Design a protein with these regions (language model features):
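Short connector loops at secondary-structure junctions
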Residues: 2-25, 96-103, 188-211
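Hydrophobic alpha-helical scaffolding
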Residues: 23-30, 65-69, 99-100, 169-173, ...
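Beta-sheet entry/capping signal
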Residues: 1-4, 45-49, 90-92, 160-161, ...
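Non-catalytic structural scaffold of enzyme domains
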Residues: 5-28, 37, 42, 106-109, ...
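Conserved small/polar residues in nucleotide/adenosyl-binding loops
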Residues: 215-219
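N-terminal glycine-rich phosphate/adenylate-binding segment common to multiple enzyme folds
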Residues: 21, 30-93
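Short acidic, glycine/serine/threonine-rich loops at helix termini
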Residues: 15-20, 58-67, 105-110, 174-177, ...
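A charged, amphipathic alpha-helical module
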Residues: 98-197
Length: 220
């Protein structure tokens, strides 16, 4: 397979998809999805993959939520009915449903879906998954190393860095409205939560986890 991701978010991309937004009250990132689907169609892709992932293992050592945001996990359903890439553009739109409570669930479900959809052998899927896991681990290690270096530098200089506590899609410059740039232009380093060493080992036993979503802060 040759992987093609949609282009960088722009205001024009966002506006292009607005006509198919089914609810004006849905969040901005969800509205932006419609424009990204159009972008992939324009790029000439022959298939679009937008899985429905309901659960993923928590990254914190404490027992916290495993559920994904209702919009994140439900929006592939919305896109299938509002934009319908298969009917409108002739582009197959894959929206498999996954429940990844642990790594074993993920591996079994990926093997089953790839076999059913593309007739790909389970051993080949396992090898690809292992390579992806190694690549992700390498990335996370490099990110943590760089975060540690930044924190050490600001301590030595008597300054400080800013951690923008957010969800992964807030890394999109259009979604975060350029907030990281606002700090960095003033010489203040900006880190994402996963760049902070030890962030997944924070003791949450004294917190009340009153939410059902990942990436949302607990109440003190």
């Amino acid at each position: 397979f040759k992987v093609r991701v949609s282009g960088r978010s722009t205001k024009a991309m966002y506006e292009r998809g607005l006509a198919h937004v089914t609810s004006d009250t849905v969040c901005f990132p969800a509205k932006l999805v419609h424009g990204h689907i159009r972008n992939l169609v324009d790029a000439g892709v022959d298939r679009i993959f937008m899985p429905i992932i309901t659960t993923v293992p928590t990254e914190n050592t404490a027992s916290t939520s495993e559920w994904m945001c209702a919009v994140v996990k439900g929006y592939p359903y919305v896109m299938r009915n509002s934009d319908n890439p298969e009917e409108r553009f002739g582009v197959p739109f894959d929206t498999p449903l996954f429940h990844w409570y642990d790594e074993g669930d993920r591996n079994r479900q990926l093997k089953a879906w790839c076999k059913e959809t593309f007739d790909i052998d389970a051993d080949l899927v396992a090898k690809a998954t292992e390579q992806a896991d190694r690549a992700q681990e390498t990335f996370e290690n490099q990110l943590q190393l760089r975060g540690r270096q930044v924190l050490e530098n600001v301590r030595e200089d008597g300054g400080y860095a800013v951690v923008i506590a957010s969800r992964p899609y807030h890394n999109d410059p259009l979604v975060n409205h350029g907030l990281p740039k606002l700090f960095s232009e003033r010489g203040i380093p900006v880190l994402t939560p996963d760049a902070v060493p030890g962030v997944c080992n924070v003791d949450l036993s004294n917190s009340r986890i009153d939410i059902c979503l990942l990436y949302t802060s607990p109440s003190p």
